[in-house]
A protein has these predicted regions:
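Bacterial N-terminal signal peptides
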Residues: 5-16
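Boundary at the C-terminal end of the N-terminal hydrophobic targeting segment
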Residues: 16-24
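Boundary/entry segment of secreted carbohydrate-active catalytic domains
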Residues: 23-51, 196-197
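C-terminal domain-boundary segment and adjacent tail
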Residues: 24-32, 64, 74, 140, ...
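Active-site metal-binding loops of divalent metal-dependent hydrolases
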Residues: 42-45, 96, 227, 259
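Solvent-exposed, polar/charged alpha-helical surfaces in well-ordered, non-transmembrane soluble domains
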Residues: 51, 55, 83, 126, ...
């Protein structure tokens, strides 16, 4: 398990290092001569993450980021297994306590499943800040980590009509948003608003195509998964395994790691570039 000190040292080392010699000067310098990066994230703390996603990741020699809300039933029932998952090198990320969301998504579609008590329309920035801060303490008790990342619930970034992105900035190394796209301009990326693709009921070929796009553009592809082989907003286990197999086969050119590890490198490179200007 990586400590906060190790991560901060990683940031310092990455900032001091120059771009890989194999990379063109205009390309973002990924570690080990890789030409792109991929992050695999899993939302909502589900049983299928413990039963399917994590074992399949480990079989492929990969690690993922699991965004667990405090009210997750799986977390309550299987807490020792979630602690063990973190001990095996996976990241536990903050997904608030009560998974608050807006009533309507960006497309104007209603989310009738959101309880009235947890509508972001009725939250204040202070309330979401304090809820997320409390969840950080819960996660600290689980894995001992001080450096944390966040995933905006439902990819929503406002509380009571006011953006809460900047209010969370002091609490996190980085935060995952939505937009169903990759980050092609990594140097100009806001670490607190990293785009991701919410993959739902798609096959392995389409999942791999998203990773290939990152490779073609030298960018960062963040996958946003929910259920794996079951539960809600699912992707089949077979499709998930096909993606993992492709990533394992292409590990020399595509760096796949946790959101925390990848964003520690991105932030370090951004700081190094700013210091040179």
């Amino acid at each position: 398990m990586r400590t906060a000190a190790v991560l901060l040292a990683l940031v310092g080392l990455a900032a001091a290092a120059g771009p890989a010699s194999a990379q063109p000067s205009t390309a973002f310098p990924w570690p080990g001569g890789a030409r792109a990066a991929v992050v695999l994230t899993y939302d909502d703390g589900m049983d299928t993450h413990l039963d399917h996603a994590a074992p399949d990741l480990e079989a492929a020699g990969l690690r993922g980021t699991f965004y667990v809300p405090g009210h997750s039933e799986s977390l309550a029932r299987r807490l020792p297994e979630w602690r063990a998952l973190a001990a095996r090198g996976h990241e536990l990320g903050n997904h608030a306590i009560f998974h608050p969301c807006l009533r309507q998504n960006a497309k104007g579609e209603r989310r009738d499943w959101v309880q009235p008590e947890y509508l972001l329309e009725s939250y204040t920035v202070r309330r979401i800040h304090d809820e997320v801060l409390a969840m950080n303490t819960t996660l600290l008790a689980l894995d001992g980590e001080q450096v944390r990342t966040f995933a905006y619930n439902c990819c929503d970034t406002t509380a009571g009509g006011v953006s809460y992105i900047d209010a969370l900035r002091p609490l996190f190394l980085a935060a995952r948003g939505g937009e169903d796209r990759l980050a092609a301009d990594v140097r100009g990326l806001d670490p607190m608003l990293v785009p991701s693709w919410a993959a739902t009921e798609v096959g392995g070929e389409k999942l791999i195509a998203f990773a290939r796009e990152a490779l073609d553009k030298g960018g960062l592809a963040v996958f946003q998964f929910h259920g794996i082989g079951g539960e809600w907003i699912p992707v089949s286990r077979e499709a998930h395994q096909q993606l993992l197999a492709w990533l394992a086969q292409n590990r020399a050119s595509v760096w796949t790691d946790t959101f925390r590890q990848v964003m520690a490198h991105v932030v370090a490179e951004q700081k190094r570039g700013a210091a040179q200007r």
